[in-house]
From Swiss-Prot:
Name used for this protein in its record: Tigerinin-4O
GO biological process, one term: defense response
Chief location of this protein within or outside the cell: secreted
Lineage: Eukaryota, Metazoa, Chordata, Craniata, Vertebrata
Biological function: Stimulates insulin release from beta cells at a concentration of 1 uM and release of glucagon-like peptide 1 (GLP-1) from enteroendocrine cells at a concentration of 10 nM in vitro. Reduces secretion of interferon gamma from peritoneal cells in a mouse model. Has no inhibitory activity against Gram-positive bacterium B.megaterium Bm11 or Gram-negative bacterium E.coli ATCC 25922 at concentrations of up to 100 uM. Has no hemolytic activity against mouse erythrocytes.
Keywords: Amphibian defense peptide, Disulfide bond, Secreted
Residue runs in coiled coils: none
Native species: Hoplobatrachus occipitalis
CC terms in the record's Gene Ontology section: extracellular region
Free-text tissue specificity from the UniProt record: Expressed by the skin glands.
Subcellular location: Secreted
Length: 11
């Protein structure tokens, strides 16, 4: 449920 821009990953 958390997304990070670099690298573009959501978990």
């Amino acid at each position: 449920r958390t997304c990070i821009p670099i690298p573009p990953v959501c978990f």
